[in-house]
From Swiss-Prot:
Belongs to the FlhC family. Binds 1 zinc ion per subunit. It is found in: Cytoplasm. This is Flagellar transcriptional regulator FlhC. The keyword DNA-binding applies. Zn(2+) binds at C137, C140, C157, C160. Its cofactor is Zn(2+). SUPFAM superfamilies: FlhC-like. GO terms for biological process: bacterial-type flagellum organization; positive regulation of DNA-templated transcription; regulation of bacterial-type flagellum assembly. InterPro entries: FlhC. Heterohexamer composed of two FlhC and four FlhD subunits. Each FlhC binds a FlhD dimer, forming a heterotrimer, and a hexamer assembles by dimerization of two heterotrimers. The gene is flhC.
């Protein structure tokens, strides 16, 4: 009986730890690592202090079509396409790196992430199975997540044509005055400096706008 490589097992544990820290569900861990369910549960409890949540994973593509989730998902998937095409790593590693960049961009915009790691992983699986496609907005030229086989010639994204109540949530109403007062006191050159530093930290990674419109 061949003995299992200690190095490979260590890599699997490292990957599982990274996924758990990013909020992965147990089903994702089972699908992407070779560790047993019992070991994954123990690892999850050790890292999070609680048992992994139960229940089924998201299985509908409709969530990705709603207004805010759609452009967050579109941002992530365009990052993922770049990473998958140029990163030279496994699919799950591309997902992790892309998700970290997605979180970074959201933080730069002083926003909160809408897309969880499990949703991002599910999104990639939906694309791989042919259930979703990227459609090009005829106004801004950005590429956005859409149902497979939807007509593309007249597609307009939710940013160019937002629904009537887009962004009008209770939380947005509570935080808007704070954001407005904060923005009023920031010198005009600060956003450019912050973006330049973020770009330098990412080395050759594209900017936010590049991810949305990049052709791979």
């Amino acid at each position: 009986m061949a003995s299992k490589s200690v190095v490979l097992e260590a890599r699997e544990i490292t990957l599982a730890i990274e996924l758990i820290e990013l909020g992965a569900r147990l089903q994702l861990l089972e699908a992407e690592t070779s560790l047993s369910r019992d070991r994954l549960v123990k690892l999850y409890k050790e890292l999070k202090g609680v048992s992994p949540p139960k229940g089924m994973l998201p299985f509908s593509t409709d969530w990705f079509m709603t207004w805010q989730p759609n452009f967050h998902s579109s941002l992530f998937y365009n990052i993922y396409r770049f990473m998958a095409g140029h990163g030279g790593c496994r699919a799950i590693e591309s997902i992790v790196k892309s998700y970290r960049l997605y979180l970074e961009h959201v933080q730069l915009q002083d926003d909160e992430p809408v897309l969880s790691l499990t949703r991002a992983w599910t999104l990639v699986r939906f694309f791989d199975s042919g259930m979703l496609q990227l459609s090009v907005c005829r106004r801004c030229g950005g590429q956005f997540v859409a149902h497979a086989h939807d007509p593309q010639h007249a597609f307009v994204c939710g940013l160019c044509q937002p629904p009537s109540r887009a962004g009008k949530t209770k939380k947005a109403a509570q935080t808007r005055p704070e954001r407005q007062s904060a923005v009023a006191g920031i010198p005009a050159e600060v956003p450019q400096v912050a973006e330049a530093r973020a770009h330098e930290a990412r080395c050759t990674a594209p900017t936010l706008d590049t991810f949305v419109t990049a052709e791979v």
